[in-house]
Amino acid sequence: VLAFNPDLLVVCFGLNDSNAEMEGLDTYKEALRNIFQPAKQEKIETIFMTPNMMNTDSSKVSPGDILEPLAELFAKRQKEGLFDAYMDAARAVCQEENVTLCDCYAIWKRMYECGVDTTNLLSNGLNHPVRKMHELFAWQLVHTILNN
């Protein structure tokens, strides 16, 4: 990406990285630094956008579906705080590296805490948001750009 000399770099990842459990947290943080530091050296404005939550229950996936074991695993990781740990780590790295944060994950968490069935907002019942929720990411990114 840096070879294209962008004015702005938007980074968003962590959903799949959390599959490495807590043992992968340091690797995840290092991967973030390996993106942020070269961008900073090139004076490229960088925004880290936290991703959406994973599913919190497996009921949206039909029993016997090939995705059922994943749905159960992801729900466990989400509810037990594993993904929260990854997002907390990302926020800390952003602060350390002075990278602007667009915290969409915090919005998803707040919706969940207010009683929204966030699993219903995932198109595959696992980890990919429905089209309408992509709009949330877009608007939050615009808000972040205009206010930083």
What is each PLM-predicted segment?
Residues V1-N148:
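Alpha-helical cap/lid subdomain in secreted, periplasmic
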